[in-house]
Amino acid sequence: MTEYTLYYATNRKHNGSDRWHPKGYGNKFSDDGMENLRFGQLTLEADEKKIAKLLAKKLRGNGCGDGEKLAEYLTGCAKTARIDAYEEVLRADISDKAQPDAKLGSQAMFADLKACMEQRGDVLVFIHGFNTSWPDAVGSALALQLALNAAEQADPNRHVRVVLFTWPSDGLALPFVSYKSDRSEAAGSGYAVGRGFLKVRDFLADLHDRAGGAKPCGQNIHLLCHSMGSYLLQFALRRLDAFTPGSALPRLFGHVFLCAADVNDNALEPGQPLARVHEIADNVSIYHNRSDMAMVVSDYTKGNPERLGRAGAARPLLLHHKVHQIDCTPIVKGIVEHSYYLGGRGIIKKKKSIDGLAQDDSARKR
């Protein structure tokens, strides 16, 4: 068995009496409030040969790499993972800004990630969607990390680190009850994500101030929102705007990926909740699939307008020039066809092939 490590941030309530070494995280908000964030890393044991076999599995019409089966396998492994939250020492009754001697978990994790990036590795923040338990979230995030590093264009000397943000979605397959509950919890969790973005902004600003003219490491932080994760992003942008002076949001990410986005298909138009997402990134990619049954269910059984993740933007000409769309319908296979961001290296390859390229670069493959 081989050990695998994953970084995480969460506003879930921990399971067990030891908050720094919990048994896991549940489907309720932290007792310290929905915007309270715990940062940490977990280590799980898994069969390296089984992982390699799943990553090498050939898929019909979509290259190789069965990410969904890999996520299922790692979900089982996650139930016995060792969890180490970064310890904190600070008062809850006043702002951490007023506590110069406070010990913050976010600062400790950011420092560790900075060390990873200095070894020529990018970081990808992953926000999951609806109906996802703690083990499910860990399995998906770690599968994504392994798939990215196994992709054809992956540099063996550059290791992508996925940072999971997991929020208390129900993890219950009760379509009407769970979806409505998760939608409410996603809104509150979006503000927690925004708080996390503010912490990243402040950390990067502090690094810049202390750099003394030294060149940055040259690596990027990216963001991938799956399904209802894009709904969280709407509220994260609102919180970021509320605490950002000036007229522009801070540019935090190299690339933002909106995969199977469970938001309205006009969400990126001027005046809509995601209209300013281009301000926080160099590029924004919308991945959609016309055969995504989860999007159909969201449209018709939940009474939602047409979803962005099904047919893409309603009026493409109204999108900012940094936003582009990828129709995954021809290469996605399966019954539900919703978690295709994990489904084969064909899609993973597409993500890596456009990373860092300008919108008009001829190397971009549509």
Language-model features: locations:
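Short, surface-exposed "cap/lid" segments of acyl-processing enzymes
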Residues: 114-168
